[in-house]
């Protein structure tokens, strides 16, 4: 869920996803369009694409493969935020 994603970003990137990325560039936050504005916005673009590849209904619990795929999408995005400098590009 969104709160778990925030906690993962805080742990890996040492920053708040809500504060810095919830309304950033073209792809961070709800929806997405156009060309990513920078490397951080591209992290969000790739995250959106990753979620789009997960099929079926995501059900929390146990050995659900969809839950594992969603977690991996979130982990990759959090690592991407850590590895790419944040610039201020307000949502477009």
UniProtKB/Swiss-Prot annotation:
One MF annotation (Gene Ontology) recorded for this entry: toxin activity
Keyword NAD part of the UniProt annotation: no
Gene Ontology CC: one annotated term: extracellular region
pH-dependence of activity, as noted: Optimum pH is 5.5-8.5.
Listed cofactors: Ca(2+)
Cofactor annotation comment: Binds 1 Ca(2+) ion.
Annotated EC: 3.1.1.4
Tissue: Expressed by the venom gland.
Family classification: Belongs to the phospholipase A2 family. Group II subfamily. D49 sub-subfamily.
PANTHER family linked: PHOSPHOLIPASE A2 FAMILY MEMBER (PTHR11716), PHOSPHOLIPASE A2, MEMBRANE ASSOCIATED (PTHR11716:SF9)
Function per UniProt: Snake venom phospholipase A2 (PLA2) that induces significant edematogenic activity. Shows mild cytotoxicity on Trypanosoma cruzi and Leishmania infantum. Also inhibits ADP- and collagen-induced platelet aggregation. Does not show myotoxic activity.
Record protein name field: Acidic phospholipase A2 braziliase-II
Origin species: Bothrops brazili
Record lineage: Eukaryota, Metazoa, Chordata, Craniata, Vertebrata
């Amino acid at each position: 869920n969104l709160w778990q994603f925030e906690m993962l970003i805080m742990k890996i990137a040492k920053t708040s996803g809500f504060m810095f990325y919830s309304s950033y560039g073209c792809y961070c936050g709800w929806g997405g369009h156009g060309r990513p504005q920078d490397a951080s916005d591209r992290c969000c673009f790739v995250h959106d694409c990753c979620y789009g590849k997960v099929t079926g209904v995501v059900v929390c619990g146990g050995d659900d493969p969809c839950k594992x795929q969603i977690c991996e999408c979130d982990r990759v995005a959090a690592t991407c935020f850590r590895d790419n400098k944040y610039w201020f590009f307000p949502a477009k």
